[in-house]
Amino acid sequence: MTIAVGQEAPDFELPNQFGEKVSLSSFRGKKNVVVVFFPFAFTGTCTGELCALRDDLSVFQNDNVELLAISCDAMFTQKVFAEKEGYNFPLLSDFWPHGAVAQKYGVFNADRGLALRGTFVIDKSGIVRWTVVNSPAEARNLADYKTALASL
């Protein structure tokens, strides 16, 4: 079951594309967090969505907001993906145990071994304030993210 608005966001600690551990709780009391689960690196829709975030990064990564993009790809895949596309935000690897964080958020497709396109806007106190889950083939609308962030 997907984490709902008003619930506390499950904490996690995952390696970023450089092998550094990143935890959700490290932002508590400091920044709102946008957690973006994506199915696979190097695929058309995922690349398009993350490039749109990259191109409008000041909205999603600033003194008040942290952007964390998560897939079940290996850390080394995330590193090459970030380098190729010029992503200057954390790409976190939910590779092992495979999809454990995506499962906590209710966005893991066990049959396909991937994270669905789940987005969670989490406030500074760790509460989910907005969420949407799309199918793997359906791109998300970044304008919705901006509206959700503006309401915090």
Which sequence ranges carry the predicted segments?
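Chalcogenol-based redox active-site neighborhoods
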Residues: 1-152
